[in-house]
Amino acid sequence: MRSLAGLVFLGVSAAPLFAQQACQGLTSLALEHATITSATAVPEGPVTGGRGGGAPVVAPAHCAVQGIIRPTKDSEIHFELWLPSSGWNGKYMQLGSGGWAGSINAAGLAEPLKRGYAAAATDDGHQGGAGATWAIGHPEKLIDFGYRAVHETSLQSKTIIRALLGRSPSRSYFNGCSDGGREALMEAQRYPE
């Protein structure tokens, strides 16, 4: 991990090519029960997506990391983490989901990123929209949705932040409404540290 952090330091201070290589190098980062499926240096530009679609939002240059966390055999927690290419404020913000979750609002990561945060979101451990048929016969997925996906996303994201940016966030925040409010309370009550 030290060599990756050294490469990151060179990448941030020397040239965009090094930053791109450091970002892409995250795909080889060893994580506990998680895999980084994609790590891409993204130039400044418009992003769209998420549940509501909506007008494009301009996001600053960043390293977009996607991954899957599997703490149990039946778990499949998708997450996305955006790390600013420059101007990191030293803080982490995780976004909550609404309703039954089931997707990642990647475009929602643009706003905290513009303010210098490393920002992450998760699908809460399942892919799908309204309804909870995904939980039938899958008690581990229900636990993932209940609290584990949010916590695991936070842990894995902070490990990736340390690897790429060379230090842990000084503060962590959670932003959400609807189910995101419940997620924030579960995280604060179960893991107050």
PLM-predicted stretches and their roles:
Residues 64, 92-95, 118-123, 171-176:
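Structural recognition of the beta-strand scaffold that forms the well-ordered cores
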Residues 53-55, 89, 97-167:
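Cap/lid segment of the alpha/beta-hydrolase catalytic domain
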Residues 102, 171-193:
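Primarily recognizes the serine-hydrolase "nucleophile elbow" in alpha/beta-hydrolase
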Residues 82, 109-113, 186-189:
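Mature extracellular/periplasmic domains of secretome proteins
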Residues 18-91, 106-107:
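Catalytic-loop region of hydrolases
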Residues 38, 162-174:
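Surface-exposed patches in mature extracellular/periplasmic domains of secreted proteins
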Residues 5-16:
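Bacterial N-terminal signal peptides
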